[in-house]
Design a protein with these regions (language model features):
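Structural marker of alpha-solenoid helical repeat scaffolds
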Residues: 118, 122, 156-157, 190, ...
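Register position in tetratricopeptide repeats
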Residues: 101-102, 140, 173-174, 207-208, ...
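Canonical tetratricopeptide repeat
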Residues: 94, 126-129, 133, 140, ...
Length: 324
């Protein structure tokens, strides 16, 4: 059908919004971490007698959505005719997403398969999007081979770079670095101007003790010419990983000057690494005040403050995360 990009997976890296860190034992925050190095669900903080965890955030934010979806799904799927397959597909998809976010991975796999069953053989952007979710649920449920098969089916259909990359991550998790490297190489050959793809490859390789080889990918990414504010932001992230904080600040400033709010978050991280907590807080606050920060960003900012020993500020971030 000539489709190259699944729904929600526009070039430039936004597909990371729906995938996860396969190298983390628990999968990482749902819908956030495709790369190693981010905060995982295992992080738990006890401050003044209160427990803050990724799971706390997930349950608070998603419990009502899951309950509502269960009710809607039950109502829609018990009395619908053949003309309601599109509604059924959307209901199963949403139910599957909520199951993932609440740790019911087997139920999620079943829901996504039922969503696909409503398509009656047609394959479009929505079906590919559901396949990505299904592969995620399969991996998290422990069905690693099933996840590989699902990514392979996507690759057979349209050779999408996202699927190559994610399958490569799973091969690394299976200790099959040769196949993983092959998939990473193919992913970049299909989409060689995606900064986040280079970042993802680096962090996965670094996670598995191949840091020097990973840095080669970062060096290659820096050979690309920045064209957009997002490009400058991603270059800033790369310079940060390479320890070149001055260049990181310069690139991130360009992104901020072009009104890319998210760049404030990464600027805060740079100053955190430089030990300049005042500047770090200034940029974190700008990002927080923008209203664009989500629960996972706030938890990461809280973790940074925990690492820095500024517990009162950490509590503020954690509490703000709970309120979203």
């Amino acid at each position: 059908m000539g489709l190259r990009t699944p729904a929600g997976a526009s070039r430039g890296g936004s597909f990371f919004a729906r995938v996860w860190d396969v190298s983390a034992g628990d999968g990482g925050p749902p819908g956030r971490n495709v790369r190693a190095g981010f905060t995982s669900l295992a992080n738990t903080y006890i401050i003044r007698g209160r427990i803050y965890t990724w799971r706390t955030i997930m349950i608070k934010n998603k419990f009502m959505a899951l309950t509502l979806t269960v009710v809607l799904t039950a109502g829609m799927l018990t009395g619908c005719g053949s003309g309601d397959k599109a509604k059924d597909k959307d209901a199963y998809r949403q139910y599957g997403i909520n199951c993932i976010e609440n740790g019911s991975y087997d139920d999620a796999v079943d829901a996504f398969q039922k969503a696909l069953d409503q398509s009656v053989g047609s394959v479009g952007a929505e079906e590919l999007d559901i396949c990505y979710y299904k592969a995620k649920a399969q991996y998290l449920s422990g069905d690693v081979d099933g996840a590989i098969d699902t990514y392979t089916a996507i690759i057979d259909y349209n050779k999408d770079s996202d699927a190559y990359y994610l399958r490569g991550c799973i091969y690394f998790a299976k200790n099959d670095s040769d196949k993983g490297l092959k998939d990473f190489k193919t992913a970049l050959s299909e989409n060689n101007d995606n900064y986040e793809l280079y970042l993802g490859v680096y962090e996965t390789l670094s996670k598995y003790g191949m840091n020097d080889q990973g840095k080669e990918y970062l060096d290659n990414a820096l050979k690309l010419k920045a064209k957009t504010a997002d490009d400058y932001m991603q270059r800033g992230r790369i310079y940060t990983m390479l320890g070149d904080y001055d260049s990181a600040i310069k690139s991130l400033k360009k992104a901020i000057d072009e009104k890319l709010v998210k760049a404030n978050y990464y600027m805060g991280e740079v100053y955190q690494k430089k030990g300049d907590n005042d500047s770090s807080q200034k940029y974190f606050k700008k990002y927080l005040d923008s209203g664009e920060a989500d629960s996972y960003d706030l938890m990461n900012m809280g973790q940074a403050q925990m690492d820095n020993g500024t517990y009162d500020t950490a509590i503020t971030y954690f509490q703000n995360a709970l309120e979203l």
